[in-house]
Amino acid sequence: MEFLLLLSLALFSDAMVMDEKVKSGVELETASAVCVYDAYYKDHTKYWCRGYFRDSCNIIAFTPNSTNRVALKDTGNQLIITISCLVKEDTGWYWCGIQRDLARDDMDFTQLIVTDNREDRANGFSSDPSGNRTRSCRASKAVQKAEGSRMSILIICILITSLGIIFIISHLSRGRRSQRNREVTGKSISRNPQASQGPSMVSITLARI
């Protein structure tokens, strides 16, 4: 009987519930979402994914892993998702999910809207009044741009070096061909006087006769 009760709980209950269906955030700040789940699933893998349809959403991270901007924290009955350094491209639909063995993964969604207007900040999002997060995000973006510039310069240097090597090889190849042509021409010239002496000697002999 207890097994049937647990089985029905696994099959028909809502194991994962999102705290809010719509969230608003501000660029360069931090967003956080909380998904509450039944403690029965505390040892199950949870995940955070993006997409309008649950069955085709793109998984961003599984517990206990995180990415450079998305951190997942599993407390045993809550999955806390934190997105740092928000950008407008983060606007979209997101799902928190829990993997289940005997049933379809249970998931719940929220819509995230990121703006550049600080007055549109809504509940569910944390901000740092001192502006440390904003400065950190801007510094991170500056580092990324600097790394991109260094990579572009490196690619240009490699291209210039490659073109220089190709030019040198081409120049040496043309020089060798020219030298061979001169050698062939010299040999031809040295042979022609011998060939031209024949007719002159014949003409002299005929004249004497």
Swiss-Prot record:
Keywords: Membrane, Signal, Transmembrane, Transmembrane helix
Sequence segments annotated as region (Disordered): 179-201
Cellular location(s): Membrane
Family matches, as InterPro entries: CD300_family_receptors (IPR050671), Ig-like_dom_sf (IPR036179), Ig-like_fold (IPR013783)
GO CC field: membrane
Record-annotated membrane-spanning stretches: 152-172
Main location: membrane
Biased composition (Polar residues): 187-201
Signal peptide (residue range): 1-15
Domain of life: Eukaryota
Membrane topology reported for the UniProt record: Single-pass type I membrane protein
Name used for this protein in its record: Transmembrane domain-containing protein TMIGD3
Originating gene: Tmigd3
